[in-house]
């Protein structure tokens, strides 16, 4: 990007600045959904833009002023509240995600687990080189199951709610369709894909919920 005279912008909600330092890797502008891990309680709608130079800050400030972008004081208060516990929550999210990811990859119903903190993940070496940790968000590719079976699995989950905005204290699970979004490479997966967010609940309770869900998946196939 820099060789072509362009600025490099990065979206960094998965790791946050605690687990990945974009400016140390040549990034110029960092955006992040503060709705997710910064807020941490699924009760705020907020985004952040962080820049590396004073000149960029003036440009962003002028643009925000011209567009009338102004977060409410309550939203800012909730984000500041979340920042106080961010490091503690991320540590728990990572620990729970590791437990779930390792458990899921041993299941016969699962074809692949997409989580760079796993030693056998294709991106593990890059993650280990550049990141200081992992968060609670990861993907699961099931083996070949019909949509009705996946729906049956999801409908009966108790701890894992269905929700798009991850990063809060609760665990979430939704179906995903990576094949529809790929442009550079073709998606190859043995079956349906799920996106999981490991919340702050007890991992044993989450595993019990997943085990029952996978049983429904198999029974409905």
Residue map of PLM features:
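Conserved PLP-enzyme active-site core in the AAT-like
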Residues: 1-109, 114
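Active-site-proximal loop/turn and secondary-structure-junction residues that shape catalytic pockets
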Residues: 14-16, 119, 170
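Hydrophobic side chains in well-ordered alpha-helices
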Residues: 60, 149-153, 206-210
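A common structural junction motif
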Residues: 67-68, 155-165, 213-221
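Short, well-ordered beta-strand elements within core beta-sheets of diverse protein domains
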Residues: 79-88, 135-144, 194-199
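Conserved small-domain helix->loop->beta segment predominantly found in fold-type I
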Residues: 98-158, 164-167, 178-188
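PLP-dependent enzyme catalytic core of the Aspartate aminotransferase-like
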Residues: 144, 171-221
